């Protein structure tokens, strides 16, 4: 039986690969997509998500979400993904539109209609998920678990200790991590290992139309290079759903720092139990890189 999932995303070049995997992995049933401001503005992430759905002729409803973080000014990662968020490929025009309700309400409504609890996957800032949990707490029993790409047990990528998705809205992340729902965190500890090699990247233009499109996007992606390999951060969250045996998980207490002058957005991961607090997150700490690369090749070969 296919696993029903809802995907909250901020496309983003590596988001595009994650969306492809969510659509084409035969083990998954992508039922709803929502967008959030993150890599670029929410207007751009929504446009990019709709372009991808049209490219793959995927009839999946999409709702536009939060334009700004809960309490602080927005930040973006245009330096990594380009000003549009998906520079490098000319998508054809379409007339698709997002749903007429905010993302968190679309998630609420879809959860309440679902015949069984649904897995949420969040690969951008956690603003929409925090709004859902704070404004619609009655939804919690309908969430099977939340798998996120975000955080780090060690070094960051936008400050010395903070990962971008968490640092973009620390208050939202703190709300989510305190919520009591089951959470799996795929942070930089594994995503920095999730590299597509130059040899594989060179094969993409001849793979299929998706490979050709992704290769064009990758030439504008600044998380690595075509010569040294590219990090597929967001794709790890999808891989964990399909191939959990590739990941080493450890239950830990995780809190999000929201006040520190130099540490705001840091995920404080208590690996050794120093704080004596019960674990609230399963943290991915290691990745079978070869197995991950093999799975990526398999799923992208299906994305025609």
Curated annotation (Swiss-Prot):
It comes from the Bacteria. The active site is at residue 233. Its EC number is 3.2.-.-. GO terms for molecular function: purine nucleosidase activity; uridine nucleosidase activity. One of its GO terms (biological process) is purine nucleobase metabolic process. The keyword Hydrolase applies. The keyword Nuclease does not apply. It is an enzyme of class 3 (hydrolase). One of its GO terms (cellular component) is cytosol. Keywords: Glycosidase, Hydrolase. Belongs to the IUNH family. RihC subfamily. Hydrolyzes both purine and pyrimidine ribonucleosides with a broad-substrate specificity. This is Non-specific ribonucleoside hydrolase RihC. It comes from Shigella boydii serotype 18 (strain CDC 3083-94 / BS512). The lineage of its organism: Bacteria, Pseudomonadati, Pseudomonadota, Gammaproteobacteria, Enterobacterales.
């Amino acid at each position: 039986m296919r696993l029903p999932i809802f995907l909250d995303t901020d496309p983003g070049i590596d988001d595009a690969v994650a969306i492809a995997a969510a659509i084409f992995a035969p083990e998954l049933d992508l039922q709803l997509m929502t967008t959030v401001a993150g890599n670029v503005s929410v207007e751009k992430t929504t446009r990019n998500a709709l372009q991808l759905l049209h490219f793959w002729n995927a009839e999946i409803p999409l709702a536009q979400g939060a334009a700004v973080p809960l309490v602080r000014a927005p930040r973006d990662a245009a330096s990594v993904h380009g000003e549009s968020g998906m520079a490098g490929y000319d998508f054809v025009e379409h007339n698709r539109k997002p749903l007429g309700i905010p993302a968190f309400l679309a998630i609420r409504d879809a959860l309440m209609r679902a015949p069984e609890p649904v897995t949420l996957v969040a690969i951008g800032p956690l603003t929409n998920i925090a709004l859902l949990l704070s404004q619609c707490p009655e939804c919690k029993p309908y969430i099977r678990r939340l798998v996120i790409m975000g955080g780090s047990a060690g070094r960051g990528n936008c400050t010395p200790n903070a990962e971008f998705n968490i640092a973009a809205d620390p208050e939202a992340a703190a709300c989510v991590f305190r919520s009591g729902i089951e959470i799996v965190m795929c942070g930089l500890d594994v995503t920095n290992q999730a590299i597509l090699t130059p040899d594989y990247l060179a094969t993409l233009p001849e793979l299929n139309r998706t490979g050709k499109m992704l290769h064009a996007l990758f030439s504008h992606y600044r998380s690595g290079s075509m010569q040294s390999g590219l990090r597929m951060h967001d794709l790890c969250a999808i891989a964990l759903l399909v191939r959990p045996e590739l990941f080493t998980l450890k239950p830990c207490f995780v809190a999000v720092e929201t006040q520190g002058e130099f540490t705001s957005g840091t995920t404080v991961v208590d690996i050794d139990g120093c704080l004596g607090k019960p674990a609230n997150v399963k943290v991915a700490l290691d990745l079978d890189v070869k197995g991950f690369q093999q799975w990526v090749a398999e799923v992208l070969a299906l994305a025609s």
